[in-house]
Amino acid sequence: KVNPERAKQWAEEAVASGVIETEDQEIGFINSVTGGGNPLVEIWNSWSDTRLGAGYEQVLRAYNHPFLNMLFEKNTRIVNAKEPNNTLEAGTKVCGILAGAHVGQEQGSTSNPYNGFSQLNPKAMGSAPLYLMKLSEVCFLRAEGAVRGWNMGGTAKDFYEKGIREANVIDRTLQHRSLRQKYENAVDNYLTIESATPFTYVDPTGNDADRVSQITVGVKWNESDSKETKLEKIITQKYIAGFPNSLEAWVDLRRTGYPRLFNMLNMADGDGSLSDGAMVRRLPFPGSTDDATLKEINETGLKALGGPDKQGTRLWWDVNAPNF
């Protein structure tokens, strides 16, 4: 949006110079090579530090995506143990936490009702690589470029469908062939989905109101779709395939507005620059309590930022303009 011609030039130059086109070229920490396991499993499951987000759950349920039950476990502990009339027994369903929810400070399943929400499936994610750049991401980037009329070396449809086929996050070795086969067996039918399945999120704790999913686009590629609809399909599937790379997903969300996620809760907890329905556009500068750093922020940082040091200030590339 900032400079479409420059974006086109650089994207076409990148493709002409060579980009990731095979699984062997993917970049990341491959645990079957480096040894050890995926640290996210330790962080999620052992430390009880992280749980599935309702936004990701929403998108997976919209398409009955294989990842829902492949990558995540049903609530492994009781949810809302202190509320006998509103308790979700362990092993009932895959459930995520709404962004912005007040989850409490304790980590015990009795003291914190959110502790029992869905963890990672260690069988699928225990040896999953930590990808820095996946083949699927490159495919979706090229699909978007093709929709914009750039020379990406192929069609948007072909790149889009290949991105979905290459979305698997598990280890690519034969060690987990059965899990990989499970995903591959589901892809052909997945690519024919015409529209999203309606979904209403119900908070198992009862703390927050029900949320109706705003995702309506299907998976199937239709050449008759508008450019905007094609972009929404690409970014929505890219969001699924990119798990657990949340930073890349946040960039796309700010850049395009997709996928259509639930609004964040408790916006008043922010720095006053965010209204209901908005999202965090950036992280404020760190170290603002240090005199030297604060001086640097005031003299150069704010000038480069072009706005106040707030969560709602857009970065230079985050332009409030149509996608096309």
What is each of the regions a protein language model found here?
Residues N263-D271:
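Long, compositionally biased
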Residues A7-C139, A146-M264:
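Extended ligand-binding clefts on enzyme/binding-domain cores
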Residues G270-F324:
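Extended, compositionally biased alpha-helical segments that mediate assembly or anchoring
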